[in-house]
């Protein structure tokens, strides 16, 4: 079913807001700088505004679209040897298998607000197979991802994603550039996985746990949030003030906390 302007009808359950401003599409393409030989994957192409621009620059790439009503229109844009169309939930896609033995993936998408954060974490499970990511997200989410210690937006999301990626907010996009018009601003951002990774495999789960626990109650001090895990003396030994709050700690401090919990577990 089509709506005014010739666009397919957006489905609320998929969180669809279609990008309709060509100038913004051009800015996105300029930021990505796609090149022949790139192993590019577009998530949530919808009716294909960005897809069409990418087709002019790439001999082949893949799109992943959940909405089956979009599939026929996407397949009509180019032959399958140039445009591979997967009807799938990106949260269930095995990006490591998608990368295969080829070049690391370049992933781009205008992500639905309701799945953006879990989708980024899902992709980061395959960070070794990912060269970079460029995503349109709710501006508030981008602000949290790129936030620095001591800022109001800094929190669990900032610490977790920055542990795996260098992050950059590239530009803000006003609601009027989408249809249906969302209620909030969006922002386009870049994420580049660290090479080599900052977190060794044995530290990844303890790091996630200590970050979640540290931010569990933002108004409480670290000594309170980490009670039963690390003592005030343990924190002082790590050069961390027990009376400080999680939002004041930098990445290195959270690494030290995670390492301390692992060492503590090894002693017990």
Curated annotation (Swiss-Prot):
Gene Ontology MF: a single term: 16S rRNA (adenine(1518)-N(6)/adenine(1519)-N(6))-dimethyltransferase activity
Localisation: Cytoplasm
GO cellular component: cytosol
Annotated binding of S-adenosyl-L-methionine, by residue: 17, 19, 44, 65, 89, 110
Keyword RNA-binding listed: yes
Signal peptide (residue range): none
Pfam families: RrnaAD
Broad class of enzyme this protein falls into: transferase
E.C. code: 2.1.1.182
Entry keyword set: Cytoplasm, Methyltransferase, RNA-binding, rRNA processing, S-adenosyl-L-methionine, Transferase
Key word Transport present: no
Major localization class: cytoplasm
Catalytic activity line of the entry: adenosine(1518)/adenosine(1519) in 16S rRNA + 4 S-adenosyl-L-methionine = N(6)-dimethyladenosine(1518)/N(6)-dimethyladenosine(1519) in 16S rRNA + 4 S-adenosyl-L-homocysteine + 4 H(+)
Annotated SUPFAM superfamilies: S-adenosyl-L-methionine-dependent methyltransferases (SSF53335)
S-S bonds: none
Family (UniProt): Belongs to the class I-like SAM-binding methyltransferase superfamily. rRNA adenine N(6)-methyltransferase family. RsmA subfamily.
Function: Specifically dimethylates two adjacent adenosines (A1518 and A1519) in the loop of a conserved hairpin near the 3'-end of 16S rRNA in the 30S particle. May play a critical role in biogenesis of 30S subunits.
Protein name: Ribosomal RNA small subunit methyltransferase A
Species whose genome carries this gene: Acidithiobacillus ferrooxidans (strain ATCC 53993 / BNL-5-31)
Name of encoding gene: rsmA
């Amino acid at each position: 079913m089509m709506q005014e302007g010739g666009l397919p009808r957006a489905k609320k359950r998929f969180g669809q807001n279609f990008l309709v401003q060509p100038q913004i599409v051009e800015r996105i393409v300029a930021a990505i700088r796609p090149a022949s030989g790139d192993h590019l994957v577009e998530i949530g192409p919808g009716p294909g505004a960005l897809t069409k621009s990418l087709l002019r620059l790439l001999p082949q790439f893949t799109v992943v679209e959940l909405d089956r009503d979009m599939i026929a229109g996407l397949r009509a844009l180019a032959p399958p040897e140039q445009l591979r169309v997967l009807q799938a939930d990106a949260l269930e896609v095995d990006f490591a298998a998608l990368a295969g033995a080829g070049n690391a993936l370049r992933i781009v998408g205008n992500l639905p607000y309701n799945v953006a954060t879990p989708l980024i974490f899902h992709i980061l499970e395959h960070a070794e197979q990912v060269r970079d990511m460029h995503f349109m997200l709710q501006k508030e989410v981008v602000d949290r991802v790129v936030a620095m210690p001591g800022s109001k937006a800094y929190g669990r999301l900032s610490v977790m994603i920055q542990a795996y990626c260098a992050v950059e907010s590239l530009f803000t996009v006003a609601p009027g550039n989408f249809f249906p018009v969302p209620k909030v601003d969006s922002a386009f951002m870049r994420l580049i996985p660290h090479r080599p990774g900052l977190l060794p495999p044995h530290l990844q789960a303890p790091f996630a746990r200590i970050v979640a626990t540290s931010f569990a109650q933002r108004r409480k001090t670290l000594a309170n949030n980490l009670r039963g895990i690390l003592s005030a003396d343990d924190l002082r030994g790590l050069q961390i003030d027990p009376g400080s709050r999680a939002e004041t700690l930098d990445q290195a401090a959270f690494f030290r906390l995670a390492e301390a919990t692992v060492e503590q577990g090894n002693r017990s």
